Amino acid sequence: MPQLRDSGTRSLHATEPVPSAEMDGFCRIFGVETEYGVAVTGAERPVDAGQVAMTMFQPIVSRSRSTNTYLANGSRLYLDVGSHPEYATAEARDPREALAQDLAGEHVMRNLALKAQRKLRESYGAHATIHVFKNNVDSAGHAFGCHENYLVRRFVPLETIEHQLLPFLITRQLYTGAGRMTPDGFQITQRADFLDEAVSSATTRSRPMVNTRDEPHADPDSFRRLHVIIGDSNRSQWSTWMKLAVTHLVLCAIEDAFRHGVPSGFEQYAFADPAAANRTVSRFLDNPRAELTLESGESVSALGLQRRYYAAVKAFIETHGDALAGSLPATTIDTIMGEWSRVLDALERGAYDALADRVDWAAKKCLFDALKRRRPDVTFAQMEQLELDYHDIANGRLYGSLVARNQMRELLTGDNVEYAVHNPPTDTRAALRGRFVDAALNVGAQFSADWTHLTLTAPERREAILLDPFEAEPTLGFEQLMEALN
């Protein structure tokens, strides 16, 4: 993964102690990194995907002299390995804000693709069409990711996260999976067949479900950045919001239990074989009551385990409700729990059609089932094309038609997304990064940035360190940096 500079924070030390509200409370930083797939159809001769990606990023290179840059909304935009355009959202305090920033990434990628498409047609014919897929597996079977980031308190050991959180992450795919049509049938997740380890610091030699590489992008003595790899890329706004929201509540319960030396209620949920459990969950529709083996020797279904997590979190909320309510600026705990309860009830009843307006895999299953009823002779290749259209944010029509017919719920309006394209969250350090990047671009200054540093490289070198991701107020170093810029 390309870096503008070394963004590790192990060598940095906070000049002031971390505020107790951040360490003792439940506030959190959320972020989503999405890798996109790129393809071209209708060209008069073959076009390499790498060439397409570079054409998309030509305006970025012209402006920033790099394919790796930060934007005025505080996000990061870059080309990942394998010519996959990637967008990493600015730091957000609330799942709803993180969703807005993620949708802003779709908007940015779509605009880059359509501009590149016009240029490509000059050389490859009037029908050359660029497709940008927000999914996780291409037609050749190569997998790429959607990674969630959660700031967690460092006093929680990684072993605790592995044993208590991973079973939740695996089974939450019942309502956050994007679904995938395979030659062997329909799976509710996209990446289960590609993830081979539970936790690891590697991302290329192996494919872990949770990455343990220690890059907190915050005070390293107080926080770690939990880098979740197991999740799918979602088109559904509800699914993106939901996976962040419910994971936050489970993390709060784990952190508080360890903080006070009491049980979280999740201690006995570790899987004997997480990879095997993940593959079983992905094939949920083959046998919704399939049992997963825990380390204790007990067996439980995926839905049964989600019920247990729900009950434990509900009990936790009864004693910590006020503190939890203050942790999220825009999302209520009652809303999260209500949505969680309703989706589990629908899964229990097998009412998958009732989930098609919010759960990606359910929406796609309904589409495939309807197609097979109308055309019993439909081929796998045709269904695969339908699925790709669902995930195509540049020229796809299927997902947009579902939204237009009110068959897919939207949590945010187009105006919300347009605002997030141009503006960072106002209550994290992204506000400062966005302000600096916007000003530097406006005056044509030479600068560099990463998650914790802002640097003016010419005409004079100045740097500001933003170690606290919760802090949106300008530091003295930031004010001096802006003075030098102006």
UniProtKB/Swiss-Prot annotation:
Keywords linked to the UniProt accession: ATP-binding, Ligase, Magnesium, Metal-binding, Nucleotide-binding, Ubl conjugation pathway
Catalytic machinery residues: 80 (proton acceptor)
E.C. designation(s): 6.3.1.19
Pathway(s) the chain acts in: Protein degradation; proteasomal Pup-dependent pathway; Protein modification; protein pupylation
GO molecular function: ATP binding; ligase activity, forming carbon-nitrogen bonds; magnesium ion binding; ubiquitin-like protein transferase activity
Residue ranges the record marks as coiled coil: none
EC class name: ligase
A biological process from GO: proteasomal protein catabolic process
Record: residues binding ATP: 76, 89, 451
Keyword Nucleus listed: no
One Pfam family here: Pup_ligase
Positions contributing to Mg(2+) binding: 33, 78, 86
Catalytic reaction equation(s): ATP + [prokaryotic ubiquitin-like protein]-L-glutamate + [protein]-L-lysine = ADP + phosphate + N(6)-([prokaryotic ubiquitin-like protein]-gamma-L-glutamyl)-[protein]-L-lysine
InterPro entries: Pup_ligase, Pup_ligase/deamidase
Domain of life assignment: Bacteria
Extra remark: The reaction mechanism probably proceeds via the activation of Pup by phosphorylation of its C-terminal glutamate, which is then subject to nucleophilic attack by the substrate lysine, resulting in an isopeptide bond and the release of phosphate as a good leaving group.
Function: Catalyzes the covalent attachment of the prokaryotic ubiquitin-like protein modifier Pup to the proteasomal substrate proteins, thereby targeting them for proteasomal degradation. This tagging system is termed pupylation. The ligation reaction involves the side-chain carboxylate of the C-terminal glutamate of Pup and the side-chain amino group of a substrate lysine.
Family of the protein in this entry: Belongs to the Pup ligase/Pup deamidase family. Pup-conjugating enzyme subfamily.
Protein name: Pup--protein ligase
Origin species: Bifidobacterium longum (strain NCC 2705)
Gene encoding the protein: pafA
